[in-house]
Amino acid sequence: MGEQQLDCALDLMRRLPPQHCDKNLTDLIDLCPHLVDDLLSTIDQPLKIAADRETGKQYLLCDYNRDGDSYRSPWSNTYDPPLEDGQLPSEKRRKMEIEANAAFESYRDLYFEGGVSSVYFWDLDNGGFAGIVLIKKEGDGAKNITGCWDSIHVIEITERARQAHYKLTSTIMLWLQTNKSSSGVMNLGGSLTRQHEMDAPINDQNTHLANMGRMIEDQESKMRLTINEIYFGKTKKVMSDLRSTEKQSELEKQDEIVRELNNAMANRGN
């Protein structure tokens, strides 16, 4: 019964607007308090933004930079609120973290023309390591259109001699809302999750960053194409069909004229 309830809850959350995720998740937990741990660990929530007290730069919050009620900034490597014994990445991972944050800032500006990004790394018990790349871009409300893009990429790396195995899990949450006098209010949103694994040669940590960068870039490109062609394309078709029902009689007349012209041309050919 518990597994069935969890599956139904996850299926429901996939169909609800991402911008209301916090409220919907709270309501689900109230309905099924015994599923609280599973729901919190399974459901991706829209990313929240904080500002580094030392540098003033913005960064994104997630479970992987959290220790208790404090969050670690990727810029100063300090916790807010301050935490004396908070978990910190090893020197090797911290160096990679600094380089990755700089690289994905450039990636974010190139593909999203702004927004906020954060990268965090940590060591795994099996000798490998893992990281998470977060990107958030909010719409500016121009032309009465608001919205937000959140992408979450969790990647696990296992080194084998001069080879590395990469396992990537990517989630994109997107919502758009238009409010125009001519068309009224329309909400469009949802989430998409994909996984991908690959093996690649390595020389040093810079090779890791290059491999991860290409992998994430390719994954985001494919997911963006899927969202654009399948989800937005299907919505556009549905809206077009709804609008065309008012002129159904005119369309039928046009079809009849086309058939008559085709028949006339066919008879002339005979």
UniProtKB/Swiss-Prot annotation:
Organism of provenance: Caenorhabditis elegans
InterPro entries, per the entry: CapZ_alpha/beta, CapZ_alpha/beta_2, CAPZB, CAPZB_N, F-actin_capping_bsu_CS
Gene: cap-2
One cellular-component annotation, GO: cytoplasm
Keyword Cytoplasm attached: yes
Family (UniProt): Belongs to the F-actin-capping protein beta subunit family.
Keywords: Actin capping, Actin-binding, Cytoplasm, Cytoskeleton
One Pfam family this sequence matches: F_actin_cap_B
One annotated GO biological process: barbed-end actin filament capping
Protein name per the record: F-actin-capping protein subunit beta
GO MF annotation list: actin filament binding
UniProt keyword Cytoplasm present: yes
Location(s), subcellular: Cytoplasm, Cytoskeleton
Principal localisation: cytoplasm
Subunit structure: Component of the F-actin capping complex, composed of a heterodimer of an alpha and a beta subunit.
Function according to Swiss-Prot or TrEMBL: F-actin-capping proteins bind in a Ca(2+)-independent manner to the fast growing ends of actin filaments (barbed end) thereby blocking the exchange of subunits at these ends. Unlike other capping proteins (such as gelsolin and severin), these proteins do not sever actin filaments.
